[in-house]
Amino acid sequence: MDVRLHLKQFALLCFISLLLTPCGLACGPGRGYGKRRHPKKLTPLAYKQFIPNVAEKTLGASGKYEGKITRNSERFKELIPNYNPDIIFKDEENTNADRLMTKRCKDKLNSLAISVMNHWPGVKLRVTEGWDEDGHHLEESLHYEGRAVDITTSDRDKSKYGMLSRLAVEAGFDWVYYESKAHIHCSVKAENSVAAKSGGCFPGSGTVTLGDGTRKPIKDLKVGDRVLAADEKGNVLISDFIMFIDHDPTTRRQFIVIETSEPFTKLTLTAAHLVFVGNSSAASGITATFASNVKPGDTVLVWEDTCESLKSVTVKRIYTEEHEGSFAPVTAHGTIIVDQVLASCYAVIENHKWAHWAFAPVRLCHKLMTWLFPARESNVNFQEDGIHWYSNMLFHIGSWLLDRDSFHPLGILHLS
């Protein structure tokens, strides 16, 4: 038996080495995996276009207005001056107010300045408006918090402004608006914004149903647990819990609550997480979409104890709540029923099938471990806090292969 066990362990090590070989090749010199991708073609924004395509002060963009900052405010210390020599500040007030901004805004602006010089040699980024202390903007403008800038190029060539907008998006601004023929408006999330800390998770208080019918808080799930999930056709089944993509018991975040009335259910999850909704044009009748896209009148799939199948139920209302702790469980089938509502195990990218395919190595390793070590202690619950390394790696690979528009706006913050 010892010989067979050692052979199994040796086979596992060889298999893992084969899995990791492509990753090593990608980091090394030469051709193949390590070959540098051709720079993607950047598309200029159209006049009056804004990215992301939501209102500026919403969760998916720069977040809510938090109050005007004056020189006498306690929050004035949040503003730091930007003396980057590669940026021209108009400073028509002669107070250096335009140079004051939050750290996040400064970081994005400095990144954009480099992009501008690389794209148009000899041209610099120009800031016409930054922090405003004189009340020249609309009420609740993010200029009053040092979270917004209006920009042009140093040569004031209006034909460049569409591309300048695109470069600002690529630089990581949370909201970019080709606002006028005279400038581009860019803004960022607040430094302490709960929105800036949102990925794709459920609160720890959310519950799942185990194979024996009992309920269990998501935060207490352990490897070896079997929970209710569904296949691609929406049939309810029991699936193995494999791991947490994200495991954060302490951070306070903002969640979207999707509420139905008949029967009454509440699914609480972050904006970038995928949930299944009714779609008559899809072959299975359902499709996965970001929680932030769900609206009253849409239908979600609800499981009731009295029946074995999922029921299509109309969403009554959508609202937000803050909770402490967030967890993103992964099952062997890539789906999970949380608080009686069917959701995906994945987030950030709006394609459930792609995400599930990307986690195939994780599922395979789980099966191998079960086969190689059948006598190992079940219900192992140790996992370090934070985003799992495999998930983090996939995100960075995806960001290299796909356009930023392929990701949920909040998911892009992982790159910031």
Curated annotation (Swiss-Prot):
- Its domain of life reads Eukaryota
What InterPro entries does the record tag this protein with?
Hedgehog (IPR001657), Hedgehog_Hint (IPR001767), Hedgehog_sig/DD-Pept_Zn-bd_sf (IPR009045), Hedgehog_Signaling (IPR050387), Hedgehog_signalling_dom (IPR000320), Hint_dom_C (IPR003586), Hint_dom_N (IPR003587), Hint_dom_sf (IPR036844)
Residues bearing a lipid moiety (Cholesterol glycine ester): 200
Residues lipid-modified (N-palmitoyl cysteine): 27
The protein here is known as: Tiggy-winkle hedgehog protein
Species this chain originates from: Danio rerio
Site positions (Cleavage): 200-201
Q: What is the lineage of its organism?
A: Eukaryota, Metazoa, Chordata, Craniata, Vertebrata
Question: Which SMART domains has this protein been placed in?
Answer: HintC, HintN
Q: What residues does the record give for site: Essential for auto-cleavage?
A: 273
Q: What is its EC number?
A: 3.1.-.-
The UniProt subunit note reads as follows:
Interacts with HHATL/GUP1 which negatively regulates HHAT-mediated palmitoylation of the TWHH N-terminus. Interacts with BOC and CDON. Interacts with HHIP. Interacts with DISP1 via its cholesterol anchor. Interacts with SCUBE2.
